[in-house]
Each structure stands twice: as C-alpha cells, then as structure tokens.
C-alpha cells in the first residue's frame, strides 16, 4: 500500500522549498520579471484561456457597471497583452503566480478544479520562431527541474533521484507512427516510461490519421511550435505532465487555426485583432504546474496531498482506503 514519505507538516515545509527554489531559478535563467496577475478578466476582452475550447469559465457580473467577468482558466493570452502594455522588448519576459478555477476539470489523482502554476511569457523576434529555439527553452527549464531534484536530494535523500540527464524530444506525429495501435494518452505513457523525461512537439492540429494528439485552443499556441513536458512518475507509474508551453501564434498561424476550428467570430476580439494586425509582440510562453511539480518531486500519489481544494466525499473515502491523506 502507498505510504507518503512525509507527514502533512513536513510536506507543507517541503512545498515551500520546491516553489521558492523553482521560482528563483525560473526568473534568473529565462530572464523574467515577476508581475501581479488578475484573478478575472472581462468577457469581451477575449483574454481568458479557453483551453480545449469546451470548458466553461465561471462568469459573474460586476455590480458597479454590470459588465460580465470571467475567472481565468490560465493567463496564456493576458501575459502577451501585458508584455505589450508594459513596454517589454525582445528577450525580456514576465512570470506570475497564477491561481485559477477550472469548474469542468475531471477530478482524478492529477487533476483538481483549483489550478496553481507559474505562468510565464517572453518576447521573441520573428527569426526565433523555430523548433530549435523552442527546444533550447525546454532544455533550460528542464535544467531547473534537474537542479531542483538535486537540491531536494541534499535535504531529503529518501526522495531519491529519477530524472535522466537529458530530456528527449519527439513530435506527436512520430509518436503516432511509433505506436499506431495506442491511444494518444497511452503513447505518452509508453514514451515517458522509455525515456523518463520527454517533450512532445506539435499539439493541437490533426495528425496523418485525422485524429489530434490532444486539443489546444486555436488562439495562443502555434500548433507546430508547442508541446508538453512529461515525466515518468515513479509512484503513479504513469506519464505525468509538468508543463504545457509553446511559441505563440503570429498573424498567419492564428488566421489558419481560427479557420480550422470554425472560430472566425474571435477575430473581432481586441486580443485577436492585436495579433492579426501585428500590434501585439511575438512571444513564447507556458504554464508550469506548481502542485504538479510538488506532487512529482515529493513523490506523492495524489494532487490533493500538495494543495487545498474541494473533493467529493466518495473520492476522499477512496483515498483514505489507499492511505492517501488529502489536505
């Protein structure tokens, strides 16, 4: 039966250790400045992240003006807008401590309706919009993960070390070609188990089979220049997503992707106009799950062991039977 390697109190202390170390190194190595972030945005702005395009944001109206607001799913679009508003230049970027509510999340060991992540965004020049630049950025972030594991091992040697020296890059099409009989999720399990750490490139567009590896909103990532960082989780014995990131759409790719998804109505939103008219800067960015990170590096079996959220009674009871104690 599962046995946590730390008490709840020890876990809380270690969570701070994980977050403090990672935040400090992320800012230094990607040259990012921390900024304050909104919990909600106006509906008409189009700044909310609509994820896979089907999740419902929490909406409410403001008493003062009656304006409709949405609690954010993530800050994928807001960050790009902020870089423009704050006058950042190529090579400069920002990050923020993002908290969100995703009401339609299907709850399980790795998914909660409460989301906490380091959301970051950086301005790039046109010639940087390449797979090579994407991979270089992934390697920088992976280097932080490696150093974090080493740092924790010095304090908590019983946590062990599992990450390989290098992260492996593979495209979603290469995965389909390699494992045509498997579902996309099972392909992720297979490749993560084989290598320990992988970055899957190209998520959102249809593969040669006609199926997508996974859904992505049409209006933030360029589907050819994005991907997910996956580790093999030693406790769950499955693939484990730590980050979704990518080079963002330019006017050409946004135009193409909105057409593919049948979302031409979004062209009228301020955010989308800013991209289509080349007003907003070209960027790369992503979200790095804080609770996911703590769950992996502290070797936890459930995300509820590293964050406070709301869980159905039957799920709490099932966890108790497995010796999993949720916050």
UniProtKB/Swiss-Prot annotation:
It is found in: Cytoplasm. One of its GO terms (molecular function) is ATP binding. Pathway: Amino-acid biosynthesis; L-asparagine biosynthesis; L-asparagine from L-aspartate (ammonia route): step 1/1. PROSITE patterns: AA_TRNA_LIGASE_II (PS50862). It holds the Pfam family AsnA. It comes from the Bacteria. Keywords: Amino-acid biosynthesis, Asparagine biosynthesis, ATP-binding, Cytoplasm, Ligase, Nucleotide-binding. NCBIfam families: asnA (TIGR00669). HAMAP family: AsnA (MF_00555). This is Aspartate--ammonia ligase. It comes from Bacillus cereus (strain ATCC 14579 / DSM 31 / CCUG 7414 / JCM 2152 / NBRC 15305 / NCIMB 9373 / NCTC 2599 / NRRL B-3711). The gene is asnA.
